[in-house]
UniProtKB/Swiss-Prot annotation:
GO cellular component, one term: sarcoplasmic reticulum lumen
Organism: Oryctolagus cuniculus
G4 motif, as annotated region: 254-257
PROSITE patterns: G_DYNAMIN_2
Post-translational modification note: N-glycosylated.
Region feature (G5 motif): 277
Gene responsible for this protein: SRL
Protein name: Sarcalumenin
Localization terms from the record: Sarcoplasmic reticulum lumen; Sarcoplasmic reticulum membrane
Keywords in alphabetical order: Glycoprotein, Membrane, Sarcoplasmic reticulum, Signal
Residues spanning the signal sequence: 1-19
Tissue: Detected in skeletal muscle.
Amino acid sequence: MRALLLFCFVASLLLSGQAEETEDVSEEVPMRDRSHIEKTLMLNEDKPTDDFSAVLQRLRKIYHSSIKPLEQSYKYNELRQHEITDGEITSKPMVLFLGPWSVGKSTMINYLLGLENTRYQLYTGAEPTTSEFTVLMHGPKLKTIEGIVMAADSARSFSPLEKFGQNFLEKLIGIEVPHKLLERVTFVDTPGIIENRKQQERGYPFNDVCQWFIDRADLIFVVFDPTKLDVGLELETLFRQLKGRESQIRIILNKADNLATQMLMRVYGALFWSLAPLINVTEPPRVYVSSFWPQEYKPDTHRELFLREEISLLEDLNQVIENRLENKIAFIRQHAIRVRIHALLVDRYLQTYKDKMTFFSDGELVFKDIVEDPDKFYIFKTILAKTNVSKFDLPNREAYKDFFGINPISSFKLLSQQCSYMGGCFLEKIERAITQELPSLLGSLGLGKNPGALNCDKTGCGETPKNRYKKH
């Protein structure tokens, strides 16, 4: 009995000694210096956050007075499914994190914000840990906001997400964190892609939700783990959704210090080989190779290369932040160009329909013939002859079959009839916004002018539209 007690005592001492040794080892894990993050993103500067409210208010006014009337009149939202809200106009740049499960998306966000070992940090792990779309925003104190509340708040840019249903809103969460970087940018963490899970099992249209965030993101980080480079159906679908957004995409090969040099080169080549069929552009997106977490790089790895890659990524992020207003104005102008072209096309369809109709004609058959073969009636060629219309901006012809299937042609008016005595003409207002008002607002940023003091004699400013019925 005495021998048994002695054995138990010695065993407990050994186990406690091992536990203390393990604890000491865990405490001795070297952490990486973060000074390059603060320096590159200018987080240590004490200057107050720039106040862009005057420019954004001016931009919002141009949109509502010069663009939205034509957009609503010709139901552009039903063609592109992209409705611009006031919250979207005034929102901060959005950085979207996409990729397979457990590749380090949440860990990367924690690292960039310095949230490790704080009560603010996102939960991370080797298993799929993120099942929600998590939006990290700035706030005076730590606060969690339910998705249903975010969608109901018209001041935020997330109110259109309500259309994806209550099941999705339960998977949407907002977190306000008092962090200086979040004063200038918003991070969005997404559920990892799991190839063996059917989309229907998520309970909401996952791909449609991803497309909504992709369309509004200023920078898109697609993160990969070098040990998991398999490209399945969901990842293929994701890259199809990213078509046309190649300039915003940055591909990240994370956890790079886990591999030896030769293996890292093989993985780098394998990544390009896997993605080549999915990214059909002349200039591929930039690929960053590093390890985005707070622990020191593993020994005998390319530390200098990884650090330079990380700084390059931070410079990319800072560039998006610095060009926030320029990008926002350019986005609204591009939207206005698309709305104008859509209105011209609908007007041309309507004019052709009226020209072909006779007293004995069947209106439904006449218009069906026009929609089925618009080239026969020179619909798109006529629009290309207009001023400032590029063939690369023309929508797909097939899209108008669906559009007019929902919206009868009789529900629209000709552009020549979209004029009022006091308000002027919708087409003239949007053209003035595209050619004068928005470029002038953009130019005022470089000159440091007050946007409220622009020369309204030159730009029109959307305040007093020309009265085309006034006698001279």
